[in-house]
């Protein structure tokens, strides 16, 4: 019983030591980008705290349906990471954005294709 209480207190202490930190965002594709070829649009968000976060994948300003998201996970330092992705076939002039909202602030991260 004492070990359980110590473990719980240690977990609470570690959580209280983590400070508010904005996410690092990486936007990329599974394969090299090529217009007209199926691929995966991936947005990986890491190193953030607190864990409340929203990731939205957009094409030409509209939310892309059928996206998939990993389970929220954390590292030993109590900072979190998460990945959202979707299959897509890019066409010239398409605009793809990963919009990340954390602590009430939204920021758009663009997927650059053909550059």
Swiss-Prot record:
Q: Please give the InterPro entries that the UniProt record associates with this protein.
A: Ig-like_dom (IPR007110), Ig-like_dom_sf (IPR036179), Ig-like_fold (IPR013783), Ig/MHC_CS (IPR003006), Ig_C1-set (IPR003597), MHC/Immunoglobulin (IPR050160)
Keyword field = Immunity, Immunoglobulin domain, MHC I, Secreted, Signal
Q: Which domain of life is it from?
A: Eukaryota
Q: Name one GO cellular component term.
A: extracellular region
Q: Where is the Ig-like C1-type domain?
A: 23-114
Q: Where is the signal peptide?
A: 1-18
Q: Where are the transmembrane segments?
A: none
Its GO biological process annotations read: antigen processing and presentation of peptide antigen via MHC class I
Its chief place of residence is: secreted
Looking at the keywords, is Signal present?
yes
Name the cystine pairs.
none
UniProt cross-references to Pfam families, sorted A to Z: C1-set (PF07654)
What is the annotated localization of this protein? Answer: Secreted
Q: What does this protein do?
A: Component of the class I major histocompatibility complex (MHC). Involved in the presentation of peptide antigens to the immune system.
Q: What's the family?
A: Belongs to the beta-2-microglobulin family.
What is said about its interaction partners and assembly? Heterodimer of an alpha chain and a beta chain. Beta-2-microglobulin is the beta-chain of major histocompatibility complex class I molecules.
> This chain belongs to which protein, by name?
Beta-2-microglobulin
Species annotation: Paralichthys olivaceus
């Amino acid at each position: 019983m004492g070990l359980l209480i110590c473990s719980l207190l240690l977990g609470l202490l570690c959580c209280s030591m983590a400070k508010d930190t904005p996410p690092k965002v990486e936007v990329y594709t599974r394969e090299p980008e090529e217009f007209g070829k199926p691929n995966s649009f991936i947005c990986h968000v890491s190193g953030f705290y607190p864990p409340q976060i929203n990731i939205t994948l957009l094409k030409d300003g509209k939310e892309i349906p059928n996206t998939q998201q990993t389970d929220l996970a954390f590292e030993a330092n109590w900072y979190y990471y998460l990945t959202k992705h979707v299959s897509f076939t890019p066409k010239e002039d398409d605009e793809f954005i990963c919009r990340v909202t954390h602590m009430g602030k939204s920021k758009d991260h663009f997927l650059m294709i053909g550059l």
